[in-house]
């Protein structure tokens, strides 16, 4: 892993785990989501990162990445191109039901993914500040999103 390869290394990590991975800002992510048919219960990982090289004697010795990493799952009952997705959600679902049905599991998975990726790639996970993003994007999927800081 080079100092500047964290986004591509994270993409490879996610794809090797079988997750959908999207790198970019909200507008780009929304456009990708609009044109993607997600399989039932597949995990969607979103990353929107910026970086700051740490420099000594005019040379970068490490890079600090910050931004958002979000984990979600599209789970509504519909068939598109022969793929049916199903869910335990409904339009009148309370926040507590969303938490019990999806958000708790996604919260735990987010931390597992971040910790595993950091440990496997000699990265320091400096901070994680997570939130619940309900009905995110035109996709209307629920995500657990974290503002993160990582140093390589």
Ranges and model annotations:
Residues 1-59, 140:
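Small/polar-rich, solvent-exposed N-terminal microdomains that initiate assembly or binding
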Residues 12-13, 22, 40-42, 96-151:
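Acidic-leaning, charged glycine-interspersed low-complexity segments
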Residues 49-52, 74, 137, 151:
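Generic structural motif
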Residues 54-57, 72-81:
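Short, cysteine-centered beta-strand-loop-beta hairpins and adjacent loop/turn segments enriched
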Residues 61-76, 141-152:
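Oligomerization/assembly interface segments of phage tail-like spikes and tubes
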Residues 77-100:
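A solvent-exposed, charged loop/short amphipathic helix patch at secondary-structure junctions
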